[in-house]
Amino acid sequence: MNKKQLILLCMLAAGGSIQAQQWPDAPAEARPGTRWWWLGSAVDEKNLTYNLEEYARAGMGAVEITPIYGVQGNDANDIQFLSPRWMEVLKHTQAEGKRTGIEIDMNTGTGWPFGGPEVSIEDAASKAIFQTYDIEGGQEIVQDINVTDKKQQPYSVLSRVMAYDENGRCINLTSHVRKDKLEWKAPAGKWKVIALYNSKTRQKVKRAAPGGEGYVMNHLSKTAVKNYLSRFDRAFKSSKTSYPHTFFNDSYEVYQADWTEDFLDQFARRRGYKLEEHFPEFLDESRPEVSRRIVSDYRETISDLLLENFTRQWTDWAHKNGSITRNQAHGSPANLIDVYAAVDIPECEGFGLSQFHIKGLRQDSLTKKNDSDLSMLKYASSAAHIAGKPYTSTETFTWLTEHFRTSLSQCKPDMDLMFVSGINHMFFHGTPYSPKEAEWPGWLFYASINMNPTNSIWHDAPSFFDYITRCQSFLQMGKPDNDFLIYLPVYDMWDEQPGRLLLFLCAQSVHWRVKFSSNKSEI
């Protein structure tokens, strides 16, 4: 072999080595995803293709369709959610997603929380109304028993009427009520009569899209959740549309929903005693020991019902139809670890700018304060690690800054915060679908940065997306390795926190996790 041949052979070998070291094609899960707002669902095939091609060119790997309210003046082009036409454009989206290599996910509803036009008042989110009457015994009692709040009267159903005397005696008087009147010969003594009504919150879906307006469903009712999901089955099966890769559920923002129709029966079966026999202690705001124990049992029962009747039923339904679930459990009145772990992909949520004391990082009057506590973010990844889930996702850049004032240099620290919190599958918040012909700046959603082609940061977005993809590729191949573990003292939280319904809200976590966080810091 002469000298020239040897040099050529070495060059070819080196070239082959370099080629072998090229970064492999990343799967869709390793690339960043985005929440894809369909404003009014006013989409069309041409612009769906245009949008997906732009996202794929920049390096996105998934879109999550979330229909919301429409664009002002564009009502004529709105498409009713789950209508035959809506299913047509979803089919087109799925076909184009397959062609461009983008996974197509969708919200199991419009706006948030789950609800809509087919949620009857019977299946709507429920709340308890307690009314107390002080009665002197030793006489025939005729007492009006009715909800005093006139707005609630049409929705309230009497569940129990219980009487308690000073010696702890308890009598069930429910059968003594006829036509809103209690007729009872009260034994001697002072009696406290407590009436319980199963009523309704009357909460409507927030930011609902056309065809998605209506009551929020009762997440604690197995029947209500089943009825809600049946609407999707009818739409997908009648249109012969494939179910999406993933069904998504946003953070739990169901307010005052502290009851469900069969709650007393569920409580007795699970806790071993009847709550109605202890209404005075349950309602005692001074919170002596016995009251704290009863309220803790109440909160555990609420947690069980949400986990079983909503989260697990929703996930089982998705699996039956070939899909998986991605869920934001924060805000739930439940053990967050349990609820996060019950789905395929637990998802947390970031709020505001992560500073990390970076010199020169731009801040101004529109920069949102960071509320992304590390321990709060890690509930999702902790649940994933405990349950052996391969992915933990995040809703990223929520309320970071105003749409067009957000720079990629402000995005990166927030993304890094998610990575150190155990996140390996991030979603932007977010990307509005916008027709190519729409006048700049295109269609917008109020609560977000604007991660789409109309924003000036889109020019450099592919490099940022590539950074995310490389980080997530390694994180998804790795396994969690923690120096120490901390047990979540959920029973202490249920016991110590005031009130009855305890929502584990991110914005209020400073109150319910104070002892947990201080102990963690000491460790």
Q: What are the residue ranges of the model-derived segments?
A:
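Aromatic- and acid-rich polysaccharide-binding/catalytic face
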Residues: 189-218, 339-364
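Alpha-amylase-like alpha-glycosidases and glucanotransferases acting on alpha-linked glucans and related
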Residues: 153-210, 278-305, 381, 385
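Mature N-terminal segment immediately following signal peptide/propeptide cleavage
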Residues: 20-62
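Active-site mouth loops of central-metabolism enzymes
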Residues: 37-46, 217-218, 400-407
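Acidic/aromatic-lined carbohydrate-recognition and catalytic surfaces
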Residues: 68-176, 184, 193-197, 205-206, ...
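Carbohydrate-binding surfaces of carbohydrate-active enzymes
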Residues: 32-33, 49, 62, 82-112, ...
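An acidic-aromatic substrate-binding cleft motif
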Residues: 22-38, 197-200, 208-222, 242-246, ...
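Bacterial Sec-dependent N-terminal signal peptides
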Residues: 1-21
